[in-house]
C-alpha cells in the first residue's frame, strides 16, 4: 500500500464543450495514447445523437446518461472470521463519476454496431433513456447491495 494517497490530478476542460467530465470520458475512451482518435469518436457520437434526436443537444444527452448510470451504492468484499461477505457501501462522488464513465465505455465497446462512434452514440442514448448494458450494470449493483443489506453493519 502507499504511504500516502496519490494526489488527484486536475484534467483540462475539453476545447469544444469546456467540460472536465468530457475530457475524462475521452481519456477513458482512448487506446494506446491516441487522444485525437478518441476525440473524433466522441464528437462524432454526439453528432450522431443530434441527428437521431433533432431537438436534443448531444452534450445534454451525454450528461443525462452519466447521471443515470452513476451508482449510489456498491458492494465490497470483507472477510469476517473465515467468511467473505459482500458488504454494501455508499460510493463517493468522484468514484460514482468514474464508474459511470467506465461502464458506458465498456458497454459501448461490447455492442455490435459498425463503428465505435455509432456504438457510443447508441449506448449514450440508451443510458439517457434508462436502458442498455451500462444502466443494467448499475441495476445489478443495486440488486447485489439490496440482497446483502443484512451485512451493512460490517461497513468500515
Curated annotation (Swiss-Prot):
CDD domains: uS7_Bacteria (cd14869)
Record flagged with keyword Protein transport: no
Entry-linked SUPFAM superfamilies: Ribosomal protein S7
Molecular-function GO term, any one: rRNA binding
Any one Gene Ontology BP term: translation
Record-linked InterPro entries: Ribosomal_uS7 (IPR000235), Ribosomal_uS7_bac/org-type (IPR005717), Ribosomal_uS7_CS (IPR020606), Ribosomal_uS7_dom (IPR023798), Ribosomal_uS7_dom_sf (IPR036823)
Pfam family, one: Ribosomal_S7
UniProt superkingdom: Bacteria
Protein keywords: Ribonucleoprotein, Ribosomal protein, RNA-binding, rRNA-binding, tRNA-binding
Cellular-component GO terms for this entry: small ribosomal subunit
Sequence similarity: Belongs to the universal ribosomal protein uS7 family.
Function: One of the primary rRNA binding proteins, it binds directly to 16S rRNA where it nucleates assembly of the head domain of the 30S subunit. Is located at the subunit interface close to the decoding center, probably blocks exit of the E-site tRNA.
Subunit structure: Part of the 30S ribosomal subunit. Contacts proteins S9 and S11.
NCBIfam families reported in the protein's UniProt record: rpsG_bact
UniProt-recorded name of the protein: Small ribosomal subunit protein uS7
Taxonomic lineage from the root: Bacteria, Pseudomonadati, Campylobacterota, Epsilonproteobacteria, Nautiliales
Amino acid at each position: 500500500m502507499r504511504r500516502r494517497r496519490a494526489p488527484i490530478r486536475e484534467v483540462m476542460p475539453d476545447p469544444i464543450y469546456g467540460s472536465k467530465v468530457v475530457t475524462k470520458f475521452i481519456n477513458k475512451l482512448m487506446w494506446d495514447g491516441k487522444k485525437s482518435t478518441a476525440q473524433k469518436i466522441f464528437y462524432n457520437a454526439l453528432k450522431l445523437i443530434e441527428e437521431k434526436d433533432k431537438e436534443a443537444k448531444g452534450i445534454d444527452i451525454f450528461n443525462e446518461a452519466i447521471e443515470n448510470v452513476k451508482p449510489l451504492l456498491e458492494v465490497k468484499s470483507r472477510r469476517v472470521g473465515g467468511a467473505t461477505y459482500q458488504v454494501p457501501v455508499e460510493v463517493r462522488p468522484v468514484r460514482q463519476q468514474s464508474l459511470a464513465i467506465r461502464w458506458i465505455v465498456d458497454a459501448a465497446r461490447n455492442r455490435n454496431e459498425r463503428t465505435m462512434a455509432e456504438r457510443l452514440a447508441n449506448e449514450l442514448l440508451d443510458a439517457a433513456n434508462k436502458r442498455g448494458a451500462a444502466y443494467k450494470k448499475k441495476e445489478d449493483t443495486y440488486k447485489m447491495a439490496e440482497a446483502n443489506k443484512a451485512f451493512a453493519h460490517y461497513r468500515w
